[in-house]
């Protein structure tokens, strides 16, 4: 271990490059670098020279150059990354692991992997922009070099450098890369034909991956994923190539608790660097258009209280009466003490209103979706799932371990083709009624006909359609004949109904099965009877009074027309009926900048980013309500046009 204070030593960079010839062309044989104190220069030069001339290289060195450069700035001292091991049985499994990790950052992970395995040989690394797959290095044949780094823990660098230590040297290099501004992750496959390991550096942890290639394979490379909103490519390159760094011992390699902390901090930092961090806004008022938060007044265009029923006196009175009569808690699951007369009333009202024999009421729409799909699907079921389905539907498929086929959004031909190819015992088609990110209405009737022709079950999640579309607000299926209605209709009470909870509308057989076997129903505490009473009152209100539904639909039509005229949405979206309006923005950083500028103008609009939408396809998500006025909508359209045209013209793209 060095005894000198590293911040008071005049450090030197000692670099070695050895070249030979192969097929009459120059060939790189070996290269290494170390930062050393003056007293260690001689032994370092000797060690690097010994490495260059050592037998075993593919090509014999014909020229060895050793250069010495005194640093003009003090090196930064950082700890080495904690290390882990990912054992893979073969290159196929190892490369799938690379693809799985890459998919967190780039839309086409297989393309990024090809840079590692099939790209032209270069001594540096490829710099790839997260979210776009765009290559950023100035010279793709040279790549980005990582230089001017050394090992602060090495007591005899000359002897150490005489023989290459792949793992140790890779950890040092990766530690410097991970500390660079804007870097999210690094991936490496060694180009040494006889070194069959690679590494992934992400979330502040260096993971060695075994069997990334066959012995004798000379191909390899490195990819550094960066966030250009955090640092531009020139800044990142300059830091990697010129900023001196000394790497000390890992602070967490042998302490599990510290390792966990570092791992979690790394994940959080990577999430932040990708522009994905969110913070909740705290409300001091109800979800009215003219809302009040702890940051001040806000014109609200991001609430799902579409009809304003959360402040409807009849709903509130029903809840007040119930809390006095039945208490504030259910006290248990639905099969123990958690079912009250209020729960039965809510289920009866929902089923009668939406035209199904039974409704099964649960604590949230998310829970109802997962519980229903987990019950229906299993490894013997193929689920045909729309590409824009909500996370709760996706999670339900994962928990069920069903074979899931994702089809393009609202593509009936793709659904038909997928059903033709089903080889499992049963099939299930899964879609939303009104899509939660775009507000478009699914072609449910035609979809049901196709699915039933193949003997498949149809499940429709109409969380954003119930209460908002249809002549009387009964959702995307209201006008369909019985032959075109889905087998299972999922919904929520937390949006248009203005309360809480979720439900599945089903037949008698499935209702009984769910009440006995659906895990989200059996093993979760029941929603409060107060909530159930509010849901029953909200449904009863809508059965007898549709004026709020009409007001909402008029606002949606007006807003879509004005937004299309302002070129903020495509003409095709002007005629969609859903209360959610998708404003395409692009990069996450631009969506956040737009959201912040709108907030400064007093408007609260959601910036929807990965993982709710694809990386690089962020949107502003407008939610209309029955209580918005013509003036509110005019302010919205004008502000959006000004912000997206003017205030963000210089925002990162």
From Swiss-Prot:
Pathway membership, UniProt: Metabolic intermediate metabolism; pimeloyl-CoA biosynthesis; pimeloyl-CoA from pimelate: step 1/1; Cofactor biosynthesis; biotin biosynthesis
Keyword Ubl conjugation: no
Enzyme Commission designation: 6.2.1.14, 2.3.1.47
Keyword terms, alphabetized: ATP-binding, Biotin biosynthesis, Ligase, Magnesium, Multifunctional enzyme, Nucleotide-binding, Pyridoxal phosphate, Transferase
GO BP: any one term: biotin biosynthetic process
Cofactor needs: Mg(2+); pyridoxal 5'-phosphate
Signal peptide: none
Record has Cell membrane as a keyword: no
Assembly and binders: Homodimer.
Role according to the record: Catalyzes both the decarboxylative condensation of pimeloyl-[acyl-carrier protein] and L-alanine to produce 8-amino-7-oxononanoate (AON), [acyl-carrier protein], and carbon dioxide, and the transformation of pimelate into pimeloyl-CoA with concomitant hydrolysis of ATP to AMP.
Name by which UniProt lists this protein: Biotin biosynthesis bifunctional protein BioWF
Organism name: Cutibacterium acnes (strain DSM 16379 / KPA171202) (Propionibacterium acnes)
């Amino acid at each position: 271990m060095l005894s000198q204070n590293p911040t008071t030593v005049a450090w030197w960079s000692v670099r070695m490059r050895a070249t030979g010839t192969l097929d009459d062309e120059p060939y790189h044989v070996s290269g290494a670098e170390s930062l050393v104190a003056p007293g260690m220069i001689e032994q370092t030069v000797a060690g690097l020279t010994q490495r260059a001339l050592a037998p075993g290289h593919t090509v014999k060195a014909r020229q060895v150059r050793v250069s010495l450069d005194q640093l003009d700035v003090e090196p930064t001292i950082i700890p080495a990354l904690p290390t882990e091991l990912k054992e893979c049985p073969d290159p196929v499994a190892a490369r799938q692991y690379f693809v799985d990790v890459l998919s967190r950052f780039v839309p086409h992970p297989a393309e990024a992997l090809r840079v590692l395995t099939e790209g032209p040989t270069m001594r540096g690394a490829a710099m790839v922009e997260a979210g776009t797959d765009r290559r950023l290095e100035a010279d793709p044949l040279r790549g980005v070099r990582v230089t001017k780094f050394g090992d602060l823990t090495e007591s005899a660098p000359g002897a150490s450098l005489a023989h290459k230590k792949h793992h140790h040297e890779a950890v040092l290099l990766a530690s410097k890369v991970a500390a660079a501004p804007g870097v999210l992750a690094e991936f490496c496959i060694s180009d040494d034909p006889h070194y069959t390991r690679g590494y992934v550096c992400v979330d502040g942890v260096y993971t060695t991956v075994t069997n990334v290639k066959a012995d004798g394979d000379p191909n390899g490379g490195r990819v550094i994923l960066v966030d250009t909103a955090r640092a531009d490519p020139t800044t990142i390159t300059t830091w990697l190539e010129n900023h001196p760094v000394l790497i000390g011992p890992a602070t967490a390699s042998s302490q599990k608790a510290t390792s966990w902390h570092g791992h979690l901090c790394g994940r959080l930092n990577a999430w932040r660097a990708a522009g994905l961090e969110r913070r909740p806004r705290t409300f001091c008022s109800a979800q009215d258009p003219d809302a009040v938060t702890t940051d001040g007044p806000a014109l609200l265009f991001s609430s799902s209280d579409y009809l304003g029923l959360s402040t409807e006196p009849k709903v509130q009175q029903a809840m007040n009466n119930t809390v006095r009569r039945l208490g504030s808690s259910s006290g248990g699951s639905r099969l123990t003490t958690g079912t009250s007369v209020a729960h039965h009333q809510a289920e009866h009202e929902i089923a009668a209103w939406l035209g199904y024999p039974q409704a099964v009421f649960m604590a949230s729409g998310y829970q109802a979706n997962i519980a229903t799909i987990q019950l229906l699907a299993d490894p013997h079921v193929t689920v045909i799932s729309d590409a824009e389905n909500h996370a709760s539907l996706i999670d339900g498929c994962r928990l069920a371990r069903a074979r899931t086929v994702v089809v393009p959004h609202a593509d009936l031909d793709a659904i038909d083709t997928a059903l033709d190819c089903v080889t499992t015992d049963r099939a299930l088609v899964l879609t939303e009624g009104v899509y939660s990110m775009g507000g478009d209405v699914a072609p449910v009737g035609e979809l049901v006909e196709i699915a039933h022709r193949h003997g498949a079950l149809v499940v429709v999640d109409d969380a954003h359609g119930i209460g908002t579309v249809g002549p009387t607000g009964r959702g995307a299926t209201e006008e369909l004949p019985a032959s075109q209605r889905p087998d299972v209709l999922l919904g929520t009470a937390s949006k248009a109904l203005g309360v809480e909870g979720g439900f599945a509308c089903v037949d008698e057989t499935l209702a009984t099965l769910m009440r006995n076997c659906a895990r989200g129903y059996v093993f979760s505490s029941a929603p409060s009877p107060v909530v159930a009473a509010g849901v029953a009152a909200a449904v009863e209100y809508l059965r007898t009074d549709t004026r709020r539904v009409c007001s909402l639909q008029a606002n949606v039509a007006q807003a879509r027309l004005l937004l299309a005229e302002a070129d903020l949405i495509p003409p095709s979206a002007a005629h969609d009926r859903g209360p959610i309006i998708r404003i395409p923005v692009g990069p996450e950083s631009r969506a956040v900048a737009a959201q912040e500028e709108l907030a400064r103008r007093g408007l609260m609009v959601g910036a929807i980013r990965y993982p709710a939408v694809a990386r690089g396809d962020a949107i502003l998500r407008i939610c209309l309500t029955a209580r918005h006025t013509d003036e509110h909508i005019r302010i919205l359209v004008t502000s959006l046009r000004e912000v997206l045209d003017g205030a963000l013209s210089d925002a990162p793209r």
